[in-house]
Amino acid sequence: MPATRIGFIGLGHISIHAHLPGLQPLVEAGDVEFTAFCDISEEALATQGAAFGARATYTDHYEMFEREKLDAVYINLPPTLHTDQITIAADKGIGVFVEKPVSLDMDQAVEFSQQIHRAGIVSQVGFMSRYYSTADKVVKMLSERTPRHVQIAMFYSGKPVRWWTSRYEECGGSFVENTIHMVDLVRHFLGDIADVSAFYHWRARGEGPEMMNMPHVYDVNYRFACGVVGSAITSRVLTDAGDASRREVILVCDDSMIEWSVNRVMDNGETVFEEQVQGRAAFALQAQAFVAAVKAGDPSMMRSPYGPSLNSLAAVLGANASAERAGERLSLADIQSGKVAWNPRFCAGHGTPTLD
């Protein structure tokens, strides 16, 4: 079978450190060809094109789509830079891998989802956590238990390192930009989310890193369609706390408390599954699954196709909308339909449209 011809739009941090290395073993095996890279930075194109052996490079995605024959394209852009990349790919029958968050505009994401569905192409949103072996273990355990409650804890340490991921109007805040990974993972465990209520806390001016313009603490409550209730807590105030951080999911079932982390699963305090830290192995597993689905022309092979993943997007954009409505309980159906919207251009919780 010929190599799958893949293009990349966006050569930022996640492409360079996760997706390109994740695909590299498939390139070396002859299963994948890096046909074309596209980025506005000619320096990035020259450096990464040489490092990963791209056959062609472009600064204009229109030209790339016009000149190259692609089987699939990775779209790894900040959410506010999504324009017509998915539309063009769908029109041409090209499979799409879209890094999260796929948009800050729910209406836009719904439109893209409809285009993908009409075209019948393979799609995947970059939720690699579903590909951890520990996630597989939890899914199996839950098939034999009755879950009642789930808790997500995401406590970040250190300073923000990228401009757009530190601006509320550019990334939607840490809950949208990063905690969405864990929100999607618990959806993998428990199914879709039905309702959301949230409260956020902002540091005052001068209390944190100057470049960070977004809420610093997020406290979100969910009700799942299956009846399970949950909470998700995210904190960005451990700026100078060394390595102090936490990233975990706790699922409380009848007579069973399951604790998930990247490399370990515990049940009632006992380790029941553990593996060595795999680094970015989940990205490689996700890449293998995506390429296999593209080769087979089978969208159902993916764990996070674009359409179903909109529930994860609605869950985090809905949290923002609830927080800016004093914690009002909102229906995710209303978020996805556009009846209730969050406007990323305004930071109502802080009283100003944007902070310079």
Question: How would you describe each model-predicted region?
Answer:
Residues 1-52:
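N-terminal Rossmann-like dinucleotide-binding module
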Residues 32-35, 272-275, 293-312:
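Glycine- and charged-residue-rich phosphate/anionic-cofactor binding loop of Rossmann-like
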Residues 51-115:
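Beta-loop-alpha module in the N-terminal Rossmann-like domain of NAD(P)-dependent dehydrogenases
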Residues 93, 120, 227, 326-327:
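Glycine-centered short loops/turns at secondary-structure junctions
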Residues 98, 123-125, 151, 232, ...:
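Hydrophobic residues in well-ordered beta-strands that form the structural core
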Residues 111-128, 146-152:
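Rossmann-fold dehydrogenase core element
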Residues 129-211:
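Predominantly a Rossmann-like dinucleotide-binding segment in NAD(P)-dependent oxidoreductases
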Residues 177, 183-264, 284-299, 317-320, ...:
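Contiguous beta-strand/loop segments that form the cofactor/metal-binding neighborhood of enzyme cores
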